[in-house]
């Protein structure tokens, strides 16, 4: 058993690893783990909600090619715009727009044959035909991701696993987590928003909408 005396002790090992260290630091004085007299260490665990949608944008076909590495994600960012609106979920989310002519995977996320099959065009080819298809679709896909705030609930928590240890023999965490209806409704709102934006860009949505089942 070790002890340290200091005016302030800061443990910054990330959310879950910090809880793991504290919960594993049991002693006669701290039977519940260090700093856990409230029995709340590891509780109210929460993460971002997230959803994504992609679309093929015909107006972006056959455009002049140049390097777009680094454009997308947090570089094209829309903060929450519906503050104080009446919605069926609390909090909000932001949008991250991505796509463009970047490496790898041709810059559009799928190989040209998958696009040709999706649009009912001739599949296959090599040489000049394949090169033309790659250039035609290159940079023509746009995706939108949403990242939102979930509600912290006491029922979502991590605790020390009584049966599993890491390679050093130190007990690991096990997790108890479930989404509430608020997060599910937020994800539905995300997808509705993404589809509205992409369809107003004359985009053709790719793949099935998440959560249809």
Model-derived features with residue positions:
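Short helix-capping/linker segments at secondary-structure and domain boundaries
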Residues: 28-30, 152-154, 201-205
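Mobile, glycine/GP-rich and aromatic-enriched active-site lid/loop segments adjacent to catalytic centers
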Residues: 118-124, 174-176, 180-213
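A broad structural signal for short, well-ordered beta-strand segments within beta-sheet-rich domains
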Residues: 1, 141, 154, 202-203, ...
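Generic structural signal for well-ordered, non-membrane alpha-helical segments
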Residues: 14, 70, 153, 183-187, ...
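FAD cofactor-binding and catalytic pocket of flavoenzymes
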Residues: 38-173, 181
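Conserved aromatic-histidine-acidic binding/catalytic patches
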Residues: 9, 148, 182, 186
